């Protein structure tokens, strides 16, 4: 991370944004902001917020959406977040981003539509990941694509947790 808390050593996929967060110590514990509109430059609203529990060592991959913008925040545990830009015509086509975030190093990761993403729990206990999407899940017509974690369409192999 740079002095401005920007990721070093990797080119961010076009449209991906990362905002690292600092805990605010309080007499009763700590406060952690998950999302503020002024952190990021997108004007997309938040239409749905949900939390996913990911068991120790487990992987949920690969996911992408045609239109939905994901905003992922790890509220508990430690995870590896991997992104792959398979968008033809994107200036970062073929780029992979990898981040290690969690309760001790919190961050908001914004993932644009059509970018494949996967999450691996690298800790020894259940991780909880909050997602704040700009389009609520439509049960009748889901905007959700899924391929297996070991798919040859994504050139990344998750290491053992």
Regions found by a protein language model. Give the residues of each.
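Non-catalytic, conserved peripheral segments adjacent to functional cores
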Residues: 1-108, 122-161
């Amino acid at each position: 991370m740079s002095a401005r808390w920007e990721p070093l050593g990797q080119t961010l996929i076009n449209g991906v944004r990362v905002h690292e967060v600092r805990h605010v110590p309080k007499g009763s514990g700590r406060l952690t902001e998950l999302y503020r509109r002024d952190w990021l430059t997108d004007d997309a609203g938040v239409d749905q917020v949900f939390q996913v529990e990911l068991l120790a060592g487990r992987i949920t991959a690969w996911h992408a959406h045609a239109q939905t913008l994901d905003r992922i925040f790890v509220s508990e545990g430690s995870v590896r977040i991997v992104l792959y830009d398979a968008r033809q015509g994107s200036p970062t086509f073929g780029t992979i981003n990898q981040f290690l975030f969690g309760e001790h190093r919190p961050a908001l990761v914004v993932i644009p539509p059509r970018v494949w993403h996967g999450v691996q729990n690298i800790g020894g206990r259940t991780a909880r990941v909050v997602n704040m999407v700009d389009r609520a899940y439509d049960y009748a017509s889901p905007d959700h694509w899924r391929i297996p974690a070991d798919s040859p369409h994504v050139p990344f192999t998750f290491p053992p947790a």
